[in-house]
Amino acid sequence: VQPWASLHADRVYRTDVSRVSASGARWLTAMAFGWMTGHTPRALFDNAPLRELLQAQHDAQQLQAAFDAGALRALAVTALSYTTGRHVTFYQSPHIVLPWKRSQRIAVADEIGVSHLLASSSIPFIFPAQAVQLEGNDEWFGDGTMRQMSPLSPAIHLGATRILVVGAAARQQPGWYDTVPGSGYPTLAQVAGQALASVFLDGLSADIERLQHVNAMVSRNPEIADARDGWRKIEVLVMAPSERIELIAARHVQRLPRTVRALLRPLGGTEARGAAFASYLLFEPEFTQELIDLGERDAMARRDELAAFLYGVIPDTMRAA
């Protein structure tokens, strides 16, 4: 977790005055005079620093060593092709895994590299699309959660019998809506935050419900189980944060670089109710460390359940006191 604990926004996207000002000017010009200039901005921010960060952290030899040792059976990342509209799963495995194809979804065996990681994390409008070669042609890709109707599918196709889901949407608790910050007409940042949440979070919840439904059917009717067709019981454990990420982000919005705050302020992105949108840009150590601490607390609170799921039994060293 060390890289995350010490991460700053300028290691993910450009935050200097000249770059951010130019980006804001391009968007303003495009909206006001785009019909005259014919130029359109690529994204709100330039994430060139993220490429440098990933190149420094990505170790192909270490990945191969994990495959060789049997510690990892497969790795997959997903991305949406803006070029064709298809959702693509790029996967790498030392085992024979036949690629799969569904409506608007395909899987491609490839050696996972920095370009795939950038494509999978290119948040729409915020970061630019990434070119990746597919079937001999360059296609432009964005964040893999877009149009991801079945986010558990890659793990299932790659042979998983148990899936640990680490989500970002907090578990709903009593008084949930009493803590919603702000009221009145929604700001653009508030609308954008909800729109991105619908893209990134809703598909996962629906897919988990589908998997649980299939599990119930297989349990009631064991004769329908067929691993070749995917009809098998697959255990799933969902780890969701006990606190709302946007409320944590609201406490740290002012830690964003001044240039970024200046760009977000007219959109309402520096207000508490716009914190969900700001959280996608909030790569600052105070925020990331609080998320790490939250994850550790939540994992420890469920450590017996987690250990039983991962190991089948609870190791003595992990039992709750």
Tell me the role of every PLM-derived stretch.
Residues 1-321:
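Patatin-like phospholipase
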